[in-house]
């Protein structure tokens, strides 16, 4: 199958270029693709904003734990017929509480607590999904790998609400969050609400993960959160520039990934992730080569 697909890939490319520009506009005329593009662009935009702060606060591992911790919440919510977003959000909040509890009540470090909770919740989620699929004969693998082409109008509405909440928080608390991100001790000294900022930010991380999960699934969601932010940090000179760059990269990669997935009939989630990773490595090699050249001129 793989050899056959690779053999037909050049033919598909030639077929696309031989047709008019209307072939590229076709996906935008389909309702399910329109919803997919909107969800993907919102997820990428939020991931770029939230991911920049995640990188600077060195919370990448914690975000990975949260992304996998939502799995049992999704499974339980599906079983009881309640909105999946509530189950996922509750599971992520519980995971953060347990991580902080283990860290404060024992001599274990935070990364150890994160690893324990990450493995426990993910294992529980896989077990619950297996049991549910066996009893109800339904396919829940889209929790793991995403199902952006199966987006409903309700999903679009919930995602728009989440976008509004997150943007409202960042607009109203940007200066406080920026101060806390770069110097938590000074932020506490001048009387900023540290606990509120940290707790609210983690909840918004969970909401961003839930939105992104629709696009690329639980397993790959960390890549969408981290890679655009890391790319922005490579070339950014200020926090505002990093946020802007990572958001533009995330949105561009999401758009191009979904378009390529439709044109070549390949999964959209992995395609988006691979494009973001490719851009990161290209910029990394260019910047690294430039730095090496500069260093060689200094000596």
Curated annotation (Swiss-Prot):
Gene3D superfamilies: ABC transporter involved in vitamin B12 uptake, BtuC. The chain crosses the membrane at residues 13-33, 36-56, 79-99, 112-132, 151-171, 201-221, 241-261, 267-287. It is found in: Plastid, Cyanelle membrane. It is a multi-pass membrane protein. GO terms for biological process: response to zinc ion; transmembrane transport. One of its GO terms (cellular component) is ATP-binding cassette (ABC) transporter complex. Keywords: Cyanelle, Membrane, Plastid, Transmembrane, Transmembrane helix. Belongs to the ABC-3 integral membrane protein family. This is Uncharacterized membrane protein in ycf23-apcF intergenic region. It comes from Cyanophora paradoxa.
